[in-house]
């Protein structure tokens, strides 16, 4: 593919990607509403399901909240029965948080429609195309986490610069 072909295609891809991300966020909100939660709750539970039990600090890093905000989040989720705290099997002095699995009914209500719709989409892809998608997501998730860290770092630096200039 020539650079002349690639440029417009990348522009179209960026636009479609933004639309996809918006759809993901909106579905996360709908899933949260279905479960009687807010989107941050769902993202925290997803992080725990993907990583397994985490300390509050480890969860904070994965969901982008401060440690104190994450502690309040975990307190609220624990009271509601969505997570439980327990000793870290590797270091019993530490406490870890783990997600309480959704019931099959909760899982179906919140995520069943998305699973079915995405299965329909994936049915239209060959095995080779699915491998490309897998490779994309495998590389895109860490790239977005790095971009998030860079963006947050830049935002903190900009905030500090504004604060110094205001004196």
Regions found by a protein language model. Give the residues of each.
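Terminal interaction helix/tail motif
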Residues: 7, 111-167
